[in-house]
Curated annotation (Swiss-Prot):
This is ATP-dependent RNA helicase rok1. The Q motif is unique to and characteristic of the DEAD box family of RNA helicases and controls ATP binding and hydrolysis. It comes from Neosartorya fischeri (strain ATCC 1020 / DSM 3700 / CBS 544.65 / FGSC A1164 / JCM 1740 / NRRL 181 / WB 181) (Aspergillus fischerianus). Its EC number is 3.6.4.13. It catalyses: ATP + H2O = ADP + phosphate + H(+). The gene is rok1. One of its GO terms (cellular component) is cytosol. A motif (Q motif) lies at residues 191-219.
Amino acid sequence: MDAFKLLTRATKLKGGAAPSSAQSSTRLPSTGKAANPQLFRSSEADKVLEEARHGKKRKRVAGPEAAESDDDGAELNFFGSSKARRSSASMAKEQEKEQQEQQEHRDDTSDADDADEMDEVQCRTVLNAHKIKVTDMRDLEEIQTVRVESEEPKKKKKKRKQQEESTPALTKKEQKKARRVYPQPLVSFKELRTRYKISRRLAENIAEQGFSVPTEVQLGTLPLLLEGFKVSGNSKDAESIEPDLLVVAPTGSGKTLSFLIPVINKIVRHHHEQEEERGIFSVVVAPTKELASQIVNEGRKLVHGTGVKITLMKKGMRVVDREDDDDENSHSEDSEEGSESEQDEPSTTRKKKGKAPVTKSDILVTTPLLLVNALSANRTKPMATLPLVRNIVLDEADVLLDELFRDQTLDIWRACTHPELRASLWSATMGSNIEDLAKSTIKERKQAYDRTNSYPLLRLVVGLKDSAIPNIEHKLVYAATEQGKLLGLRQLLHPAAASASDVRLRPPFLIFTQTIPRAIALHSELRYDIPAEAGGSSRIAVLHSDLSDGQRSEIMKNFRKGEIWILVTTDLLARGVDFRGINGVVNYDIPNSAAVYVHRVGRTGRAGREGGIAVTYYTKEDIPYVKSIANIIDVSEKLRGKDGEKSIQKWLLDALPDLSKKDKKELKKHGVKARQSNLKSVKDDKEHRKTRISTKSGFDRRMENKKKALIAASRNRKSKTQSTDPGSDNESWDGLDG
């Protein structure tokens, strides 16, 4: 009973009306889960999906409804004894339990067979409405030969070969149409158990996590990875083959769940079929430790009770059992035999500690360098192989196949020597060069294992490729100078009188900078901006790669718990890390590329949450580099269908200068030149002073430098005097003379 309703029964107050309107007006990502995580929807697609759901429900509900109607007549004996009524009620409950058990058994066995597949028109309607585009990346000749062979009888093959020589080449539009594929979409997460026959325990774990409506990327990828791709069309007799997959989907759309569910289900099946064979069956590669640990945390929730083990790769772990290690250990034992007896016990303990046991895990989540060092003994030996690995997953694939990680990632890929290896690449941004590299690598593997025509390579794109999510608000603010950016940031922390043009951003939020020194400087500048009553300096923290693993994990834990409100960081947290309750992102320094901007602002607005804000400050030095960001904001607003005044005006897009390819490459590698930490010339040093993050005057800074210089000089004098008087340290005080 609600106490407020009880005490206000005689009044005319309407409870709940005012709060609901207030809540709807101030809807933020931190207020909770979105009702529907999907970014793109339409009434036609919803109707098709509803028909698919209700079609199954009618079949399931038909039996219990009839039983319930029969039971109602027995329960309506109002003039019978109380014992009889109780016994009839208990009998009805027992019958209900039996019916539920029978119904669960039917759901697991017969519903998948009874469920009608969508035809190609319905599949096309659903996929187009959710802006899902699936493309076959194989050569056109290979696609056409497979389709024609499935349609034509064997007698007509000779005639077809003769006609192929005379047929004209397809236009670009016809080629795109020939490559388009319309697979069966996922209607609901319940289908994973009933139709795709995933493990019962895995299905229960998914339900416990509260997943009900699949996002666009889950709607498109899960059927392909669980059921496979029908190479010769959507006919029932067509053979389904698990494809290699390239996925480009918005940030926060559930890509981690999309690749973990099929991998876990595949390993569970393998455990049932071959109980004796154990080892690493899947490798998930991520660019940062934070993202890798997040994937492991999500995976542990899904593998609970399934018998599948998921492990985070750490320094010193052994992944394979090499014969070279045994030879080396025996050699070291022989060399230490002649040592003294006092040193025998410590040496044996050191040997035991040095050789760690081989990791017993089914799924290994790692960063590239850690696994390469483990397989090559810190680059001192040739790469060992992982012969049992059947799935390799590259999360944030565009970074892993970029110059920084490319060699390490390809070494891991080549080390997976199983002929049935499947690769899946996932990211929110993926350039054509990355796609070409992945395509060529997969093609080389197929040729090496004589499997040229065995399985397809598909690309799935959700929404517009390489664009920001449409459910957040973007603000591009000109601050002129570094001091202007600091002033704007402080206005976000301490908002004055509200106006229509002001940006209102409530904690928690992230602040991104270009370099580690700038992140440290900004943190020290903002450290005391939050009053002590609200928690003071403990509410602001800085996170970067120079910190130890323990410090980084502690900061991440406190930020997730809500003890830290504002986190200043570099691009270390720009990719993959899922902070679901973040209200906004501040780009204190502009990102190095358009792709980095997409990933930075994608830390807010996760899983369809509305109300996130992305604020980007730019100065006079940034003007040559801003156009790519302005274009992304403009496309995002068009995708959103936003009415009213746009944040990016056409005159601004026309006025901003274009950037050459050379300058783009330089910006991507080093960032804005004025903010680089390794400046050499005097002219660059003057530019660096302009971009210093500080509100101290030049006089105060000179006085501080003088003080530091005096302290350093006094320390030098003391060290010199101590070195010149060696006997003074050895003198002892004999006490007072009597």
